[in-house]
């Protein structure tokens, strides 16, 4: 498993599926938004094709969680846009944001952490089958404790599933 610089549409769909699984483990209903500079094809560019294709892959797989995209971050998070996009259950309600690449994810994470009053936990490594988290440089004590808590919780889930198999 690797962290993808620029994920393919299949990798983006897999990231969404793995993210939904983690969100469910924490007791929440996943509402996944694929983020972009474009909102639902306006403007339609080559850069957004992977995101649109990932959404189609998830539709074909008939996954058991809500998702939509591509959309800009404000559309994903601010309910005032529901009137403009009434066809989407995700607009204004997203609790998972899938970025089009590692660079945009890193920039967005640092911006949220620096400018937001909301507690940001992460970045989380998902899909490794092990409770591994990496504390970024300049992590606070609180950040490290949150990542350790996520790893401990993940470990208990992984151990529980392994015991059920045996």
Residue ranges and their predicted role:
Residues 1, 37-96:
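Active-site rim loops that border cofactor/substrate pockets in soluble metabolic enzymes
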Residues 76-77, 105-110, 142-143:
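Short active-site-adjacent structural elements
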Residues 6, 68-72, 104-108:
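N-terminal start-of-chain detector that recognizes signal peptides
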Residues 91, 95-97, 101-116, 120-124:
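A C-terminal functional module that forms or caps the active site or interfaces directly
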Residues 14, 46, 106:
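Charged, alpha-helix-enriched surfaces in structured cytosolic catalytic cores
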Residues 1-32, 40, 56-58, 111-140, ...:
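ATP-dependent carboxylate/acyl-activation modules
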Residues 35-36, 99-101, 135-136:
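Short beta-strand segments
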